[in-house]
A protein has these predicted regions:
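Aromatic-enriched
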Residues: 86-178
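Residue-level signal for alpha-helical context at structural boundaries
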Residues: 29, 78, 92-93
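Residue-level detector of solvent-exposed, low-hydrophobicity positions
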Residues: 14, 33, 43, 77, ...
Length: 178
């Protein structure tokens, strides 16, 4: 369990049954992948959207299926999107930097050695946390950070795609027609 970065490791701490954690993982990641795919297919090409799309899928592709920690080197593909957001400045730039740094830290080889040693001494339930979901987030930060990174970059990607404003315009037209 210690060297696997897929979301199944987190969900299995809630209920350790493949009949539960596999479908639960697909229900979490499936809609995110579908949104990414729809935006990628419907948006006009631009370098900005290309880097954002790559940042999303580099993290998101690790979550639904079995991956080891060394597969997380794919996260290096998110650095250009982070640099692009950093150059723009503001709160989004700081969020991108923090999320990228934490995701890269939690999936790096040396910090993971520390986490695996810590995990071997960790009790199944932490007394200061309530519930298996919080235990999983603390015990397995890599998949949790990958999910956070995926959602963050997907949010930016959707907001900046040319078709993202279309549903909002349609809702405005419907509301003004009444």
């Amino acid at each position: 369990m210690g060297m696997v970065v897929s979301l199944q490791t987190v969900v299995s701490m809630v209920h350790d049954d493949p009949g539960f954690y596999n479908p639960a993982t697909y229900l979490i990641t499936g809609p995110l992948i579908l949104i990414w795919l729809l935006i990628a297919l419907r948006s006009r090409f631009s370098k900005e959207r290309m880097w954002l799309a790559l940042a999303v899928i580099s993290a998101l592709s690790l979550l639904p299926v079995y991956h080891r920690i060394y597969d997380a080197k794919l996260l290096l593909l998110s650095i250009p999107a982070c640099a692009m957001l950093w150059a723009e400045g503001g709160l989004i730039a700081w969020l991108a930097l923090a999320i990228n740094l934490l995701a890269l830290l939690f999936t790096s080889d040396l910090p993971w050695v520390f986490f695996s040693i810590m995990l071997s001494h960790l009790r199944p339930t932490l007394p200061w946390l309530s519930g298996p979901i919080l235990n999983a987030i603390v015990a397995l930060p890599a998949p949790t950070m990958l999910l956070l990174m995926s959602i963050f970059y997907l949010w930016i990607y959707v907001r900046r795609s040319s078709n993202a404003a279309e549903p909002a315009r349609m809702i405005d037209k419907i509301a003004s027609a009444r």
